[in-house]
A protein has these predicted regions:
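Short, flexible loop/turn elements at secondary-structure junctions
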Residues: 36-41, 138-140, 152
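Internal maturation/activation junctions in enzymes
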Residues: 66-76, 91, 96-141
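Function-dense linear segments that define catalytic or interfacial modules
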Residues: 2-99, 167
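Active-site-proximal structural scaffolding
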Residues: 27-30, 54, 85, 113-117, ...
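Short linear motifs in exposed loops
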Residues: 148-149
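Catalytic or ion-translocation cores adjacent to nucleophile or general acid/base/metal-coordination motifs
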Residues: 152-180
């Protein structure tokens, strides 16, 4: 509850939980709406802000899709009330500017990027005639996406040329049956 109320945009009295990966604080019967920004080695503060702007626009538009056929009304109600975004960065330690920031300068840069995302969300929410999002940015591990785009995972450095990954599949899935 304390973390959810940190920026004053979410109700502090709700008994929040998380999504399965525990990076997003959710009400009961609520969805994530994640958008990932891939940080490249040559990104600057300006290019990151541009990428975050696009991810925030995408997430804000996606937050309008709230007609969930087959689910109870509470799912739509929670989604419409909070319009959560989850704009995150992956590959942070592939970028010298971010990796070499000090404990004082990195929070300032990340705070500036977050403020930019909040401002973009407010602008687009006004244009779309919806309420601004209650939460906009997140930090998440991003293991799968980082592999697909050849980036360090989330906020973590690259440790090895090879990784062991756990993959779960339904035992009735044709691919699982083929591999076993």
């Amino acid at each position: 509850q304390r973390q959810a109320a940190k920026y004053g945009r979410r109700e502090s009295e709700i008994d929040y939980g998380t999504n399965p990966c525990s990076e997003i604080i959710l009400r009961p019967k609520q969805f994530c709406n994640l958008s990932e920004v891939v940080v490249r080695a040559d990104d600057t503060a300006e290019s990151l802000q541009d990428k975050i702007e696009l991810a925030t626009i995408l997430g804000t538009i996606q937050s309008c899709f709230t007609d969930f056929k087959g689910l109870g009304r509470q799912w739509s109600k929670n989604t419409e009330e909070e319009r959560l975004l989850g704009v995150s960065l992956t590959g942070i330690l592939d970028n010298a500017m971010l990796a070499n920031k000090t404990k004082d300068s990195l929070p300032a840069l990340l705070g500036s990027l977050r403020t930019g995302a909040v401002n973009v969300n407010r602008k687009w929410a006004t244009m779309l005639n919806i309420e601004p999002s209650a939460a906009i940015t997140c930090v998440k591990p991003s293991g799968t996406v980082s592999q697909l785009v050849d980036a360090a995972s989330g906020i973590h450095p690259r440790h090895s040329e090879y990784y062991i990954r756990t993959v779960r599949a339904d035992k009735k899935d044709p691919l699982t049956l083929f591999m076993t």
